[in-house]
């Protein structure tokens, strides 16, 4: 599998090239082009976790209720083009399996099928912040696509930093945070 971010900046999108038998997962509604030999299915689950309850929890976090899963159906390989619903930048994150990533509402675009996706509740502070009640929790070894309305700036936090949760895209769970 090859994932390439195209058109960096305000009009970003991702081209996922699948080899025979490979699968990729995205938020429903992200697909804008697909090869004829790619099968896709829409479900409420990522891998073997969740189902209806996971879909409802994702909705509370500002994400889609459904996932789309793309599978290369023959021996030739194929392509899937994904774009965020709102124009903005797309970033590819390599997940090493040692840490968990948290994404904020609306920033998950897609991932390799070997990543586990769940919802992490922020508590009453999340509800009072005016933003989503939860984050998507993503762990495992694989690749993750996130997006933002506008540009994504990667920041290494040394001491402390205050950022409005409405402007956070994704962060590793090793980062101590409060809402």
Summary of predicted features, one role per range:
Residues 1-179:
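Composition-driven recognition of glycine/serine/threonine/acidic- and proline-rich low-complexity segments
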């Amino acid at each position: 599998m090859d994932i390439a971010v195209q058109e960096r900046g305000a009009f970003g999108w991702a081209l996922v090239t699948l080899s025979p038998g490979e699968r990729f997962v995205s938020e429903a509604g992200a697909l804008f082009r697909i090869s004829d030999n790619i099968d896709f299915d829409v479900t409420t689950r990522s891998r073997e976790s969740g189902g209806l309850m996971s879909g409802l929890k994702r909705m509370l976090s500002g994400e889609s209720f459904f996932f789309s899963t793309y599978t290369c159906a023959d021996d030739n390989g194929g392509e899937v083009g994904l774009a965020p619903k709102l124009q903005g930048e797309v970033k590819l994150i390599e997940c090493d399996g040692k840490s968990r990533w948290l994404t904020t509402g609306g920033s998950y675009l897609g991932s390799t099928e070997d990543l586990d996706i769940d919802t992490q509740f922020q508590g009453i502070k999340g509800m009072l912040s005016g933003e989503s009640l939860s984050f998507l929790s993503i762990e495992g070894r694989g690749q993750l696509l996130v997006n933002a309305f506008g540009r994504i700036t990667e920041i290494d936090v040394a001491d402390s930093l205050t950022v409005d949760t409405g402007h956070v895209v994704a962060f590793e769970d090793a980062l101590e945070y409060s809402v």
